[in-house]
């Protein structure tokens, strides 16, 4: 008798995606982050659902409802902190996943890569609107500052901002619609992730060497299911260490002060995972220029397949490109640090230099280095 998992219409889809999927035999732990992102998304949707049962999206009661969740709801505190720190784990996995794609040349799967970039934008949008919901000082002023950037768009900017606000300032209408967006976007992310997987399974996974692995494939289960379970256990370990021992480590103390439109916090800054982009935004003294640089810092990922001049796919056998890649990582860490610093000397100039270096490495140095490596190998 043929196995039901291979014949049943629904189970067949699951089987082809997670059980009998032919996978390269040599993929490393860097390939774990896809499944970890899936777990993060499921965790965020579940904890978010339980939070939404007790949250009220009204300017008068939003802050109190979050306090009520932490104090009065059974295990509300752990659900709230799992959701807040779960977002941080989500972004750590995202950055690792994108970094893996850049290092091993996975961006040559064009459809998979482009949907991945759209996913990155969608997750960033979700995290931004979510940060506004507790209605603390940083929530309010973060929403005001970031939405205000749209006013830099010529001609339609001001109308666009007022349309998003639902009035002439960030107020009740803004909070209500941000809650609606924050509820719907994760489901859009889940749908996009399925399309992402669909396109990936059309080509099969890349591997560290960047060489086609059709000649050496192994079934996904049990080899990579076991490997993924180990990754998931480690992810949950790190998440729970954060939640139970240092729940506010990555948050901002200003967000424990209720939103007050009459009092601006001394340093307005987003959550840590947006600091690199925020530093690039601040490093340009012109409003429209800053907004363009901010968007370009992520959109530049779409250009990666066009900027690939090497005759090898992966960086595994390209030491000069490897050095450049790690300089880029160091530069992004520098930008993250600068984004959290006040706008004064020497942070301004460091931020400007790091921003220039970021674009210079990706647009100029990486393609040139790849060409030099080709010539050294007499290709």
Swiss-Prot record:
<dbReference type="InterPro" id="IPR005798">
    <property type="entry name" value="Cyt_b/b6_C"/>
</dbReference>
<comment type="function">
    <text>Component of the ubiquinol-cytochrome c reductase complex (complex III or cytochrome b-c1 complex) that is part of the mitochondrial respiratory chain. The b-c1 complex mediates electron transfer from ubiquinol to cytochrome c. Contributes to the generation of a proton gradient across the mitochondrial membrane that is then used for ATP synthesis.</text>
</comment>
<feature type="binding site">
    <location>
        <position position="201"/>
    </location>
    <ligand>
        <name>a ubiquinone</name>
    </ligand>
</feature>
<feature type="binding site" description="axial binding residue">
    <location>
        <position position="97"/>
    </location>
    <ligand>
        <name>heme b b566</name>
    </ligand>
</feature>
<feature type="binding site" description="axial binding residue">
    <location>
        <position position="196"/>
    </location>
    <ligand>
        <name>heme b b566</name>
    </ligand>
</feature>
<keyword id="KW-0349">Heme</keyword>
<dbReference type="GO" id="GO:0045275">
    <property type="term" value="C:respiratory chain complex III"/>
</dbReference>
<dbReference type="GO" id="GO:0008121">
    <property type="term" value="F:ubiquinol-cytochrome-c reductase activity"/>
</dbReference>
<keyword id="KW-0813">Transport</keyword>
<keyword id="KW-1133">Transmembrane helix</keyword>
<dbReference type="InterPro" id="IPR048260">
    <property type="entry name" value="Cytochrome_b_C_euk/bac"/>
</dbReference>
<feature type="binding site" description="axial binding residue">
    <location>
        <position position="83"/>
    </location>
    <ligand>
        <name>heme b b562</name>
    </ligand>
</feature>
<keyword id="KW-0812">Transmembrane</keyword>
<feature type="transmembrane region" description="Helical">
    <location>
        <begin position="77"/>
        <end position="98"/>
    </location>
</feature>
<keyword id="KW-0679">Respiratory chain</keyword>
<dbReference type="InterPro" id="IPR036150">
    <property type="entry name" value="Cyt_b/b6_C_sf"/>
</dbReference>
<dbReference type="InterPro" id="IPR016174">
    <property type="entry name" value="Di-haem_cyt_TM"/>
</dbReference>
<comment type="similarity">
    <text>Belongs to the cytochrome b family.</text>
</comment>
<feature type="transmembrane region" description="Helical">
    <location>
        <begin position="288"/>
        <end position="308"/>
    </location>
</feature>
<dbReference type="Pfam" id="PF00033">
    <property type="entry name" value="Cytochrome_B"/>
</dbReference>
<comment type="subunit">
    <text>The cytochrome bc1 complex contains 11 subunits: 3 respiratory subunits (MT-CYB, CYC1 and UQCRFS1), 2 core proteins (UQCRC1 and UQCRC2) and 6 low-molecular weight proteins (UQCRH/QCR6, UQCRB/QCR7, UQCRQ/QCR8, UQCR10/QCR9, UQCR11/QCR10 and a cleavage product of UQCRFS1). This cytochrome bc1 complex then forms a dimer.</text>
</comment>
<feature type="transmembrane region" description="Helical">
    <location>
        <begin position="226"/>
        <end position="246"/>
    </location>
</feature>
<keyword id="KW-0479">Metal-binding</keyword>
<feature type="binding site" description="axial binding residue">
    <location>
        <position position="182"/>
    </location>
    <ligand>
        <name>heme b b562</name>
    </ligand>
</feature>
<dbReference type="GO" id="GO:0006122">
    <property type="term" value="P:mitochondrial electron transport, ubiquinol to cytochrome c"/>
</dbReference>
<dbReference type="Pfam" id="PF00032">
    <property type="entry name" value="Cytochrom_B_C"/>
</dbReference>
<dbReference type="GO" id="GO:0046872">
    <property type="term" value="F:metal ion binding"/>
</dbReference>
<keyword id="KW-0999">Mitochondrion inner membrane</keyword>
<feature type="transmembrane region" description="Helical">
    <location>
        <begin position="113"/>
        <end position="133"/>
    </location>
</feature>
<feature type="transmembrane region" description="Helical">
    <location>
        <begin position="178"/>
        <end position="198"/>
    </location>
</feature>
<keyword id="KW-0408">Iron</keyword>
<dbReference type="InterPro" id="IPR005797">
    <property type="entry name" value="Cyt_b/b6_N"/>
</dbReference>
<feature type="transmembrane region" description="Helical">
    <location>
        <begin position="33"/>
        <end position="53"/>
    </location>
</feature>
<dbReference type="InterPro" id="IPR030689">
    <property type="entry name" value="Cytochrome_b"/>
</dbReference>
<dbReference type="GO" id="GO:0005743">
    <property type="term" value="C:mitochondrial inner membrane"/>
</dbReference>
<keyword id="KW-0496">Mitochondrion</keyword>
<keyword id="KW-0249">Electron transport</keyword>
<dbReference type="InterPro" id="IPR048259">
    <property type="entry name" value="Cytochrome_b_N_euk/bac"/>
</dbReference>
<keyword id="KW-0472">Membrane</keyword>
<feature type="transmembrane region" description="Helical">
    <location>
        <begin position="347"/>
        <end position="367"/>
    </location>
</feature>
<protein>
    <recommendedName>
        <fullName>Cytochrome b</fullName>
    </recommendedName>
</protein>
<dbReference type="InterPro" id="IPR027387">
    <property type="entry name" value="Cytb/b6-like_sf"/>
</dbReference>
